[in-house]
A protein has these predicted regions:
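A short glycine-rich, Lys/Arg-flanked "PGG" loop and its adjoining helix->strand segment in the class I
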Residues: 87-99
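Conserved alpha-helix/loop element of class I SAM-dependent methyltransferases that forms part
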Residues: 1-7
Length: 216
C-alpha cells in the first residue's frame, strides 16, 4: 500500500529466491544477490521453471556490485542478523538506493525471549530443533535502537516498526516446530504453519521500512 518511487528492486540475501519471486510477480524488476552459489543455482532454476525474469548475482551485502542510486527499493529480509558487518551493509543499502527510495527489512531482536524462541527452541533443544546448529547467533541479533541508529547515520529515516509474532498458542506452536523437525513441513510451508502476524510486540522479530532522504 506504500507509494513507491519506481519498480526496480534489490533483494539483499535473496537465498533461494522465495521473496524475489513474490516481488517479481508483483511487477518489480528484481535483482537478487547472495553469497551462496548453491542457493543462487536453485533460485535461477526455480525462476526459470516459473517463467520469472529475475537477475541473480553472487555477492555480499557489505560490497554491493552496483552503482550509486541504482534501485527504487531495497529489501533485506531475515538477513541483517547474519551479516558480518551490519554498519557496512546499511551503508551499501543507502548508497545503492535512489533518493526517496525505500528500504524494507525484518530481523531478530536481541532479547531473552528471542534467545528462547530462535536459539533454544529452533536450534538447540532436540525435541523441537529444526535449524542447523549456529544458523543464528544470539549475539548478532539487533536491538531496534541499534538498527535505527545505523539507518539515521546513513540518511535513512525510519517510518514504521512492527513486531512479528504467531497467532498460535504455545502448545500449537510447539506442534508446528515438531512437524518441521520431523520433515512433515518444508521451508516454504514454515511461515504459514506458524501463522505469523503483525503485532506491537517486538521481543522476537520485527520489521519496518525507511526512506532515503530526497536530498542525499
Amino acid at each position: 500500500k506504500l507509494p513507491l518511487p519506481g519498480r526496480t528492486l534489490l533483494d539483499v540475501g535473496c537465498g533461494g529466491g522465495f521473496l524475489a519471486e513474490e516481488f517479481a510477480r508483483d511487477g518489480f524488476a528484481v535483482t537478487g544477490i547472495d553469497p551462496a552459489t548453491r542457493s543462487l543455482e536453485a533460485a535461477r532454476k526455480h525462476a526459470a521453471d516459473n517463467n520469472l525474469d529475475i537477475d541473480y548475482r553472487e555477492g555480499k551485502g557489505e560490497a554491493l556490485p552496483f552503482p550509486d542510486a541504482s534501485f527504487d527499493v531495497v529489501a533485506c529480509c531475515d538477513v541483517l542478523e547474519h551479516v558480518d558487518d551490519l554498519s557496512l551493509v546499511i551503508r551499501e543499502v543507502a548508497r545503492t538506493l535512489k533518493p526517496g527510495g525505500v528500504f524494507f527489512y525484518d530481523t531478530v531482536n536481541r532479547t531473552w525471549f528471542s534467545k528462547l524462541a530462535v536459539i533454544k527452541l529452533s536450534q538447540e533443544w532436540n525435541f523441537t530443533r529444526w535449524c542447523k546448529p549456529n544458523s543464528h547467533v544470539w549475539e548478532k541479533f539487533i536491538k531496534p535502537a541499534e538498527l535505527l541508529a545505523f539507518l539515521n547515520r546513513n540518511g535513512l529515516t525510519n517510518q514504521e516498526l512492527r513486531g512479528i509474532s504467531s497467532r498460535k498458542n504455545p502448545l500449537a506452536l510447539l506442534a508446528s516446530l515438531r512437524a518441521v523437525k520431523k520433515g512433515k513441513l518444508n521451508h516454504r510451508a514454515i511461515g504459514p504453519s506458524f501463522d505469523l502476524c503483525e503485532t506491537e510486540d517486538l521481543r522476537v522479530s520485527y520489521m519496518g521500512y525507511a526512506i532515503k532522504s530526497p536530498r542525499v
